[in-house]
Amino acid sequence: MASQLIENKLKLLPEKAGCYLMKDVNGKVIYVGKSKNLKNRVRSYFKSSQEGRRAELVKNIADYDIIVVDSDKEAFLLEVTLIKKYQPYYNVALKSGTGYPYIEITNEKNPQTRLTSIVYKDKGYYFGPYPNVYAASATLKFIQKVFPLRRCSGYTGRPCLYYHMGQCLGSCFKEVPQSEYDEQIKKIKRFLNGDIQEVKKDLTNKMLQASADLEFERAGELRDQLKYIEETVEKQKIISNDHTQRDIFNYYVDRSWISIQVFFLRQAKLLRRESHMFPLTDETDPEDEFMSFIAQFYAQKNRVNPREVLVPKGIDQDELAAAIGIKVRTPQRGQKASLMEMARENAQLKLDDKFRLLELGQRKTKGAQEEIFKALGLPYGSYIESFDHSHIQGADPVSALVVFKDGEPFKTGYRKFKLKGEVEHQNSADEVGNTREVVRRRYSRLLKEHERMPDLILMDGGQIQVEACEDVLRNELNLDIPVAGMVKDDKHRTNHLLYGDPFKGQPFKLIPMDPKSEGFYLMTRIQDEVHRFAITFHRQTHAKNSLVSRLDSIKGIGPKSRTKLLREFGSLKKIKEASIDDLRKAGLTLTQAQAVKISL
């Protein structure tokens, strides 16, 4: 339900185009949206029930601001600017940079070709990004051999090794004419833009000439260069009749999620693709979310823009082009229209796969938990809590609690308990005392703090532990929480649940669990997890108590000195390794430090 502040502001909303900025309790902008009609759009967040990501957003809105503009186009441009400025949590967040290498022709007096992952606005030429760093490296090496520029660090007064190898124009020892660089750069650009026939023809002629001149080593090098073109460049499928650099975007929406595919066309080939999926914050206008995504995509640092962006029907091309500064088109037929449909099919496939994986995962998590509740004859509940105790012949008794939410560990809910009761040896009475104490402490605190109670408690044990737990819940705390025991057979394998409610006249009975069922696997997982957690905590507690006991036995070491040692060193091993000076720095006197060294 909206706060009174928001209710009052909703009455003042204009029926105009503009942007709205949703804010949290700290005044931080958490979502930016735009609309042709601010009144209808903003009111829709608070005047109807919400689901999924939008429900989560609304829950966190404490206030909002609006900015009115003259048109929907202006609203879109402003939205792009605001998202870039505030980076709101509930808007699409894209990683900066592509993570892929580019081939750069540097903008220098003596230019060179190199690999880079950062694109600077320095008037250099950038080609890429390349999906594979090895492919990019191989292409660069080919260019440096066939179209040499500068490969050395600059003028040294003598020719470099690369000059002798024919891979440097010689700026290391002479003035290279700009026209010579321009000619080579022109060839490199043609090659990287897909025009390879001229290069093949030139290399073939040079190879034949080298053979005729009996320069067989040189002819072999040229043959290898031709082979590189045939095996790598020509093998890539040509999918366009021209060499215009294009990015193709399409999307698919299902179950309040949007899946977006980006195809990168470079050198007349499909160079690579990117997939993005995220929940829709505003389900009413997926086209707006799609356009906002593209605007953010090109707002990233180091992004090299294509000459043209292709989008599906229904997207305002002029509005998007104004936002990203790139020509935007919707193909109607031919290869590009086929690629657009391919992008949509891939977007759908990705989203369908995601939902299938989620469904499979739910069968092993939430579905498994449903099986446990169904076996007990209980309505489904999200939270299961489980206890286990650990001690060594009654020494250092502890209990541990684990929480499972919808079939998965909810680790922020885990708790540890140092038991306060005196335990002399392990028997049924001790288990009862341990259970009663930890259940009392856990749920009296939840009552006091008005926290959520679990839907089911699973005890690692049989009827003794279950009855002790139920007694405290019903008779002391007046709580009605179902309690079941995870019972082991004579081979110490858990295969049954023990459940009953004597307070409601239901006798205890063993409920078998199918060993092949997901519910059985979840039950054993809960039991293993609570046992692991209890054992680990007990080992830590026992080690610490043993250390305290050893220190207490040293003459002259009282509680204050012991605390100083524990705070400074933390373990018996480190105290043993410490020098007299180290012990004195921890706050001990010379006599105390000597006593510690002698005793340990």
UniProtKB/Swiss-Prot annotation:
The UVR domain covers which part of the protein?
197-232
**Positions of the GIY-YIG domain:** 15-92
Q: Which gene encodes it?
A: uvrC
Q: What is its main location?
A: cytoplasm
Q: Which UniProt keywords apply?
A: Cytoplasm, DNA damage, DNA excision, DNA repair, Excision nuclease, SOS response
Protein name per UniProt: UvrABC system protein C
What family is this?
Answer: Belongs to the UvrC family.
Taxonomic lineage is: Bacteria, Bacillati, Bacillota, Bacilli, Lactobacillales
Pfam family example for this protein? UvrC_RNaseH_dom
Source organism per entry reads: Lactobacillus delbrueckii subsp. bulgaricus (strain ATCC 11842 / DSM 20081 / BCRC 10696 / JCM 1002 / NBRC 13953 / NCIMB 11778 / NCTC 12712 / WDCM 00102 / Lb 14)
